[in-house]
Amino acid sequence: LGVPASDVIDVSKMNADMVKEYEVLLLGTSTWGDGELQDDWYDGIKVLKKCDLSHKYVALFGCGDSDSYSDTFCDAIGILYEELKDTRCKFCGAVDTAGYTFDSSIAVVNGKFVGLPLDEVNEDGQTDERISAWVEQVKQEIS
């Protein structure tokens, strides 16, 4: 996507003024424990909910472990989606579940992941290809 390093914002440092600057938000998180959201995100969600997201595209991505936590694979992406779906943002970057091995995930809505799930533990050989395909998809969806 050609995002400069200066535009990468740590969620723990994010504020409403930063969010206002962008038309597209790429929001990433890892899934912790048994399907939990990374702690920093709870305050980040509060910041985002105070912003007008109605004219913004939001693309979600996250990391998980499809083997050890197959029943909560990348659930944190699903938590972000659930928290933001009433903000009227335009979600983009949904990914087909084909090619992923897992039992359950709240990040799957209508048969697709609501964002890009990555598994660097068990499927690291597919990460680069998945990211490239997702970036192209997001570019098309926001153009």
Where are the model-predicted features located?
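FMN-binding flavodoxin-like domain, especially the glycine-rich phosphate-binding loop
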Residues: 4-7, 21-143
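A short beta-strand-loop structural module common to alpha/beta enzyme folds
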Residues: 3-15
